[in-house]
Amino acid sequence: MEKKNCALATMKDVAKVAGVSTATVSRTLMNPDKVSAHTRQKVENAVLEVGYYPHNLAKNLRRNESRAILVIVPNICDPFFNEIIRGIEEAAAQHGYLVLIGDCKHQQQQEHAFINLLITKRIDGMILLGSNIPFDVSKEEQKNMPPMVMANEFAPELELPTVHIDNLTSAFNATHHLQALGHKRIACITGPESMPLCQYRLQGYIQALRRAGLPIRDEYIIRGDFTHESGAELAEKLLTLTNPPSAIFCHSDVMAIGAMWQAKKMGLKLPEDLSIIGFDNISTAQYSDPPLTTVAQPCYEIGHNSMLLLLEQLQGRMVSKGSRLLDAELLIRGSTCSPKS
C-alpha cells in the first residue's frame, strides 16, 4: 500500500492493512503492553506502511514541529562516541533541534521504544552511529521512516547518506608504521566481525602485511569487543604464544589501553618490549603510560557534518546516498618504537 499523499491516513486504514479492528489499533498505540507481540508487530508495521500519525500530532506532521532527532549509539558507555555526539548536539542546537540518545546495546528491549518514536512522530530524523539498526529499514512497509544519516560506520548496502573516514587506508597506515620501525611479528586485535568498519580495518592490516611480503598468521588475528577487558584478555593470549608478536595493532584505543595494562602486568616494558598502536584518539589516549600512538578520527567533525547532512534532508533538499569522506591522521606518540634486535 502506497503512502497517502493527498490526505492523512486514518486509524481505519491501519486496521485494514493490519487485519485487525480499529479498537485493537487504538489499544496497541495507547497501551502496547496490553496486546500480544504478534499483534503489536502487525499494527506497528501497518502504521509505518500507511503513514499514520495519532490525531493529536497530525497538525505537526506537515509543519514539522517535532524539532527532535534521534541518535542511535551502539554502546553509550564507549568513550569514542563522546565527541561525535557533541558535534551532533552543537550543530542541532544551532538550528533549534533537540537530540535524543538511544543506546542500541540492548537492542531487543529498545526496539519497540524506537519504533514508537517513529510512529508518534516525536522525531524528525535519525543519525545512526553504527550499522546495527534496531529495525529493518529494508522492509517495504517501513518506507515512511524519517530521514536517516549514518555517521562513523559505512554500510553501502543500506543506501544511506554517510559521513565516515577511510578505515582500510587508516589501518594500512597504522600497520605500515609498525613495519617501518622494523616490526615483522605484528598482531591485530580486531573489533566485532559483524561491524563493517572492523572488516575494513582488518583488510587494511592484511594488505599492509602482504605489501611487505609478510605472512598472514591466523594466531595473530584475534577478535575483541571494543572493551578494556577484551583488550587485556586478548593481549595475554597473544603474549603467551610460543612466538609472540613484537607489536599489536588494536581496532580501538579502549582495547589498546587494556592491552597495554596487561603487557605491563606481565612485566613487559612499553614500547621497548612491545609496541602498541590504537585507533580513534579518545581523550585518554594521550594520557596513557606511555602515551598511545593511534589513528585520530575527526570525531567532532563526523558528528557535526552528519547533523548538517540530516538538516539538508529535513529542509527538503535532495541528498545523495553516497558518502562524505573525512581525513584521519596517524598520531605517533610513545607507545611504539623499533623492536629489540
Label each residue range with its predicted role.
Residues 105-106, 128-173, 194, 214, ...:
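Flexible loop/hinge segments that line or gate small-molecule binding clefts
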Residues 74-83, 101-110, 163-173, 189-234, ...:
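Hinge/beta->alpha junction and helix N-cap segments in small-molecule ligand-binding domains
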Residues 52-117, 121-125, 203:
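Amphipathic helical "hinge" segments at domain boundaries
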Residues 1-65, 337-340:
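N-terminal helix-turn-helix DNA-binding module of bacterial transcription factors
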Residues 236-341:
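Flexible loop/turn connectors
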